Amino acid sequence: MSLRYYIKNILFGLYCTLIYIYLITKNSEEYYFLVTDKMLYAIVISTILCPYSKYAIEHIAFNFIKKHFFERRKNLNNAPVAKLNLFMLYNLLCLVLAIPFGLLGLFISIKNN
């Protein structure tokens, strides 16, 4: 994994972390947030490991999905709204599973280099 890939993919994790920190600081009586040190540590660790998680998920998925899958299905880009929703769900999944898959991605990255 290159530094460019890491920086490109850490932006989503940073965005979610900054939203969480903003909501903690602007917390009113309407919202309930888990404001503990352990929760903040988990979010920071997830942010750091989010690109590794995405790398591991892509590495595993592309072992099962071959190039001919995309060549045969030429109408994958005909539904941009569904594609955007799927992309956001994928990024959220990478952030939520960042710690276990991030460690796996870190292992794969070290093994490939």
Swiss-Prot record:
Gene Ontology BP, a term: bacteriocin immunity
One short Pfam name that applies is Microcin
Instruction: List, in alphabetical order, the Gene Ontology terms for molecular function in this entry.
Output: toxic substance binding
Q: What keyword terms does UniProt attach to this protein?
A: Bacteriocin immunity, Plasmid
Q: What does this chain do?
A: This protein is able to protect a cell, which harbors the plasmid ColE1 encoding colicin E1, against colicin E1.
- State the protein's name: Colicin-E1 immunity protein
Organism in which the protein naturally occurs: Escherichia coli
Gene that this polypeptide is encoded by: imm
